[in-house]
């Protein structure tokens, strides 16, 4: 008998070197030799398919006979080839070009960069460690998994499988841009949940939904793996990592490479064997052009039913040749966009989706988007952008803009609510396969909820059944690429877990609930402080504990109470490097780095000024710090003191000595194409915001209700209301009122109305009148909902007293003119408890002045007492929270404080799972599952609790209740307050909060605009009624003015060629804007698109983002700005529509203002708009 297992002697065919090496490894491990027939069949398959077969066998749990398994798998390969009409290796040799099936190479169920010798099934290496091998366990019994497990939706029967377990392949076709995945096909792929790849391993809690495809249990166990490297496995992995859904039409099911994603450093040669010449040629273009090509190939025509199958034009090979691709390389972005639009873009996308801002400055951030939708049961991916922003996140700075993809998972448009299971069924596949764009693959990295404030706004809109955009953002990062231009790359050769370790050692987080909450710190929009952290002393000091009257530490629910939650200290020299006036990462000029050149920074022309408080994200040797730091002149230079309450992620002990580099060095190395493979941790000091001069302050319905409940009379609020209405009414006719209202909405209008007024343009100017009228109506709407301007109040960032000298109810309030003395009211939004408004004593402290110097604009709380004052106010802290501080004498005269809030509900102390309870693949699937639940099944407990609380408060303020009923209502309100505060912290605590039905109301006061309703006579109802009455609005009785041009602009001589050029551009703008108006998109998306549209024409005018940055001759700019003005105003007059004038001011507004000032006034004074908007112009109106 043939020792090889064959019946007849056959000449052994020559195998490709990599295949032969892999076969020898298998034979040595199994103690069996493959027969000549098996070898012949491997040779006939060709190298990629043979590699696929051998790797599948290597991953099988048990192998009865090696030769029989090879023949069975080879037969399966041939059957698939025949079904698709794909030639064998022999016949393929006669055909030019790569065959599609040969591009399909499956991957192993595990991956380790350095495999371990003799690892038992129960041995586990820490995830992300250099010697990591993913444990081969699917269930908790520790057994290794050789079968391929799959999810069985609705307990559907499995499709036909092989005797040894189903094996599938990944298809990498010459890529289509519209990707589809239909989970309900009869030929279900098992790889949607194979182990080893992020998001592919099922958590143990889902085991009951899984089946094992292998119907036969072989009797011989496969010996353990040896650590010798596998060239076939490496070859296959390199090819398959680039495979994915983008290259396939909607019909097939793609199979995810079942490994933790890792980038093979030498993928290019392999990829060249399996992709089209066009795809390779794309690698010669800059990535923004590549992305736009795929965005223009995405089927996204508004109002047009998408085709049942991917349109032929969606394949790059059908629309571009290699020569045409290379011809695009030297084109400007405008020429490039025009070419691809006329070639194929107009067939696939609407004109309104064309890229607008093509010539953005190099300092601007480019954000790449991908919308994932379910169309007719098929998942499609639409690439959009890049969108231009003026700030980057830490993630973008480390990886580069083009390596980060913001992915929006869209809801299904339907009259009926779509069940969460539908989204889980379809969208999990996206995370498992990744998102393929050309020869790049992007994989799930993190998601971020919109934050408390945005989340509450979203919840309120959802509660009111209004259409809104989800505040949850999902980020994918590029992990693999087959283009030479993409190497070197900092994530090359890393798993997703190791990639996350670059930013912070997130594996040390204790619970899954906090995993993404903490990791999302890297996607805050920030400014990098230019400081080498290796030269900075970052010292951990203890938090200041709360002490009782006996000097013992106070605990609540087993947790120590502290006074310094979220705040630390920073030396003066480092504070001087920071932006003096920075709010949420915004500066006057686009920049990502702050250095000592403080004279350029907005809000300060004195380099000795620096912020008192800096809200930061500090990434240091694997740890992550979140909070604020207070300037302390006592500290030695280059020193930062952080506290345990700020330390959100600790350094993993086993990685504490790894190589760390500054994020700015990463940027430099990436730009210089230097290798970053040795980097294991990125250090960075990221500024989120700083303490600033308070802007104008406003009341809210909640604040009015609490103040009135505390004794402030109705008359006070009605007087505020009357003043606000008169100011809004007179905004069109008085400079003081006009400036106030213009600055109230400066962020919405680029401060253009304020710029026009300050430039000397008369209030009667047609467009200015229309904008002031519009802003007046917005102001009235805000007033109607309780947003009323109030004097002698401030928004101040809070921190703790660094001296320990303030008493339990004393605070230090530092304003423009220094420290304040006397009583103050302090409140923290969104407090609901009557005790959330405190009456405190503002105390002058020379000791604090010695510590902070001349820094201003903050409130410092004491570090004495049994409980932190911040904790007493809406469970707040000092990690950047803003407090409302009032010195208003009438409020102080009437308000009577209540006892502080004390939590009455203790969350369930159930043990939560942490990341260490999952292997890497299980963890990725669980994390993405949590994202989908957050996105498509969010909790509305916060909004529900707040809504019902306000209804009960309205009854307390309105109806004469007997004592028993009043106590019952107050009891319900206190329960709602507790539930509300629990819901605020529920995401990070892993709790689910439900509002009991007995706390829910059945009717709402009319000022809440909800049904069923009753008419409220409370102070809130009266404000609503009076502000909503149109009679006092003088503007309602004024006839629309005629549209006239200012002589300064109308009489400017403009060369005919210039006017003709801008007339053409204006006509183009009208066509694009008409399409945008007609789109059925959410308002946020429309807003972004319109802004991009205006930015496009601003670049054409200025040759830069703004007038202040233009390199062009100013006289030329002024001529073109006047041409734009003349064209827009002529159109507005002919259409009798003043809104048509807006194009001139949104595109050329800054140039027009500058030109008007120079032309009419002669002298001009440069003044900071940021400074001016913090002032209130106080002329009073009385009839």
Curated annotation (Swiss-Prot):
EC number: 2.7.7.48
Reactions performed catalytically: RNA(n) + a ribonucleoside 5'-triphosphate = RNA(n+1) + diphosphate
InterPro entries according to UniProt: RNA-dep_RNA_pol_euk-typ
The keyword Transmembrane helix is assigned to this record: no
Tissue expression remark: Expressed in shoot apical meristem (SAM) and panicles.
Enzyme class: transferase
GO molecular function: RNA binding; RNA-directed RNA polymerase activity
Domain of life: Eukaryota
Keyword terms, alphabetized: Nucleotidyltransferase, RNA-binding, RNA-directed RNA polymerase, RNA-mediated gene silencing, Transferase
Disulfide bridge partners, by residue number: none
Gene Ontology BP annotations: siRNA processing
GO CC terms in record: nuclear RNA-directed RNA polymerase complex
One Pfam family, short name: RdRP
Primary role: Probably involved in the RNA silencing pathway and required for the generation of small interfering RNAs (siRNAs).
Similarity comment: Belongs to the RdRP family.
Protein name, per record: Probable RNA-dependent RNA polymerase 4
Originating species: Oryza sativa subsp. japonica
């Amino acid at each position: 008998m043939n020792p090889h297992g064959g019946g007849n002697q056959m000449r052994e065919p020559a195998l490709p070197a990599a295949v032969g090496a892999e076969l020898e490894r298998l034979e040595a491990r199994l103690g069996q030799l493959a027969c000549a027939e098996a070898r012949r069949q491997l040779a006939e398959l060709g190298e990629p398919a043979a590699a696929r077969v051998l790797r599948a066998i290597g991953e099988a749990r048990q192998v009865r006979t090696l030769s029989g398994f090879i023949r069975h798998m080879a037969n399966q390969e041939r059957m698939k080839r025949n079904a698709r009409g794909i030639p064998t290796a022999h016949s393929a040799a006669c055909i030019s070009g790569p065959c599609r099936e040969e591009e399909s190479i499956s991957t192993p169920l595990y991956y380790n960069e350095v495999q371990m010798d003799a690892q038992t099934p129960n041995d586990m290496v820490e995830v992300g460690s250099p010697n990591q091998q993913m444990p081969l366990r699917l269930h908790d019994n520790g057994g290794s998994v050789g079968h391929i497990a799959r999810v069985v939706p609705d307990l559907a029967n499995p499709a036909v499988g092989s005797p040894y377990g189903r094996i599938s392949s990944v298809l990498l076709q010459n890529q289509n841009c519209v990707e589809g995945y239909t989970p309900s096909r009869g030929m279900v792929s098992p790889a949607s949940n194979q182990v080893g790849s992020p998001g592919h391993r099922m958590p143990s809690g889902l085991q009951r939904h899984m089946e094992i495809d292998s119907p036969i249990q072989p009797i011989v166990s496969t010996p353990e793996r040896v650590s010798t490297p596998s060239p076939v496995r490496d070859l296959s992995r390199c090819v398959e990592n680039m495979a994915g859904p983008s290259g396939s039409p909607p019909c097939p099911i793609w199979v995810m490479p079942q490994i933790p994603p890792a980038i093979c450093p030498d993928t290019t040669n392999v990829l060249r064997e399996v992709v089209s010449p066009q795809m390779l040629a794309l690698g010669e273009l800059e990535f923004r052009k590549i992305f736009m090509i795929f965005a223009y190939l995405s089927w996204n025509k508004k109002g047009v039913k998408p085709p049942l199958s991917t349109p032929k034009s969606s394949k790059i090979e059908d629309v571009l040749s290699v020569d045409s691709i290379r011809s695009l390389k030297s084109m400007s972005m405008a020429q490039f966009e025009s070419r691809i639009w006329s070639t194929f873009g107009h067939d696939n996308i609407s004109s309104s989706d064309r890229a607008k801002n093509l010539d953005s400055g190099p300092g601007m951030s480019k954000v790449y988007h991908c919308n994932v939708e379910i169309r007719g049961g098929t998942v499609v991916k639409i690439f959009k952008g890049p969108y231009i922003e003026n700030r980057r996140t830490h993630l973008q700075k480390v990886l580069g803009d083009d390596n980060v993809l913001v992915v929006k998972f869209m809801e299904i448009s339907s009259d009926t609510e779509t069940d969460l299971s539908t989204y889980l069924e379809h969208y999990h596949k996206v995370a498992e396969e990744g998102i393929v764009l050309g020869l790049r693959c992007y994989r799930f990295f993190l998601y971020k909820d919109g934050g408390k404030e945005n989340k509450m706004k979203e919840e309120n809109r959802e509660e009111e059944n209004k259409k809104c955009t989800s505040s949850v953002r999902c980020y994918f990062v590029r992990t693999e690429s087959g283009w030479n231009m993409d190497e070197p790359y900092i994530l090359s050769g890393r798993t997703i877990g190791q990639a996350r370790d670059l930013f912070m050692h997130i594996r040390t987080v204790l619970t899954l609930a906090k995993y993404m909450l903490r990791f999302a710190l890297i996607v805050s929009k920030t400014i990098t402080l230019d400081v080498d952290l290796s030269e900075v002393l970052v010292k951990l000091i203890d938090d200041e504990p709360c002490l009782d009257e006996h000097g013992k530490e106070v605990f609540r629910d087993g947790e120590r109470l502290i006074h310094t939650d979220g705040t630390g200290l920073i030396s003066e020299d480092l504070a001087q490097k920071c932006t003096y006036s920075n709010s949420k990462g915004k500066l006057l000029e686009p920049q990502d780095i702050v250095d000592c050149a403080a004279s350029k920074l907005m809000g300060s022309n004195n380099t000795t000024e620096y912020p008192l408080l800096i809200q930061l994200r500090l990434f240091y040797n694997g740890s992550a710090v979140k909070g604020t730091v207070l300037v302390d002149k006592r500290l030695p230079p280059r020193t930062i003191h952080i506290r345990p309450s700020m330390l959100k992620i600790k350094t993993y002990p086993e990685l504490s000595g790894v190589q760390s580099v500054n994020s700015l060095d990463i940027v430099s190395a990436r730009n210089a194409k230097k290798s970053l493979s040795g980097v294991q941790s990125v250090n960075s000091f990221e500024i989120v915001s700083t303490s600033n001069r308070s802007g104008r302050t406003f009341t809210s319905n909640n604040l009015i209700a609490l103040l009135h409940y505390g004794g402030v009379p109705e008359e006070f609020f009605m007087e505020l209301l009357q003043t606000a209405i008169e100011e809004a009414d007179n905004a069109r006719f008085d400079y003081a009122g006009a400036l106030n209202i213009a600055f109230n909405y400066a962020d919405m209008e680029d401060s253009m109305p304020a710029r026009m007024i300050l430039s000397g343009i008369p209030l009667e100017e047609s467009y200015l009148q229309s904008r002031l009228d519009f802003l007046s109506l917005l102001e009235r709407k805000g007033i109607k909902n309780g947003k009323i301007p109030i004097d002698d109040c401030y928004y101040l960032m809070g921190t703790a007293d660094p001296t320990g000298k303030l008493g339990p109810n004393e605070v230090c309030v530092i304003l423009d003119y220094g420290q304040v003395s006397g009583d103050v009211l302090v409140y923290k939004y969104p407090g609901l408890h009557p005790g959330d408004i405190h009456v405190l004593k503002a105390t002058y402290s020379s000791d604090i002045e010695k510590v902070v110097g001349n820094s201003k604009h903050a409130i410092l709380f004491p570090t004495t007492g049994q409980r932190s004052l911040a904790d007493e106010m809406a469970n707040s802290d000092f990690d950047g929270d803003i407090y409302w501080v009032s010195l208003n004498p009438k409020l102080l005269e009437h308000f009577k404080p209540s006892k502080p809030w004390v939590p009455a509900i203790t969350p369930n102390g159930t043990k939560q799972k942490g990341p260490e309870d999952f292997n890497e693949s299980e963890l990725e699937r669980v994390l993405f599952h949590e994202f989908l639940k957050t996105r498509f099944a969010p909790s509305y407990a916060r909004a529900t609790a707040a809504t019902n609380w306000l209804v009960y408060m309205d009854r307390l303020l309105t109806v004469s209740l007997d004592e028993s009923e009043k106590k019952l209502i107050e009891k319900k309100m206190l329960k709602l307050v507790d539930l509300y505060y629990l819901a605020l912290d529920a995401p990070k605590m892993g709790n689910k909060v439900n509002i009991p039905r007995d706390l829910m109301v059945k009717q709402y006061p009319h000022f809440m605009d909800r049904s069923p309703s009753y008419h409220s006579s409370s102070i809130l109802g009266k404000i609503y009624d009076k502000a909503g009455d149109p009679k006092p609005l003088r503007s309602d009785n004024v006839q629309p003015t005629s549209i006239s041009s200012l002589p300064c602009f109308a009489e400017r001589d403009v060369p005919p060629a210039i006017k003709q050029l801008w007339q053409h551009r204006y006509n183009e703008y009208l066509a694009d804007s008409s399409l945008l108006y007609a789109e059925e998109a959410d308002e946020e998306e429309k807003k972004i698109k319109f802004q991009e549209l205006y930015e496009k024409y601003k670049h054409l005018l200025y040759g830069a983002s703004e007038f202040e940055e233009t390199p062009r001759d100013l006289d030329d700019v002024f001529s073109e700005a006047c041409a734009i003005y003349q064209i827009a105003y002529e159109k507005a007059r002919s259409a009798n529509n003043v809104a048509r004038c807006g194009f001139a001011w949104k595109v050329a507004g800054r140039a027009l203002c500058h030109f008007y000032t120079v032309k009419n006034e002669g002298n001009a004074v440069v003044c900071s708009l940021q400074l001016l908007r913090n002032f209130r112009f106080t002329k009073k109106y009385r009839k």
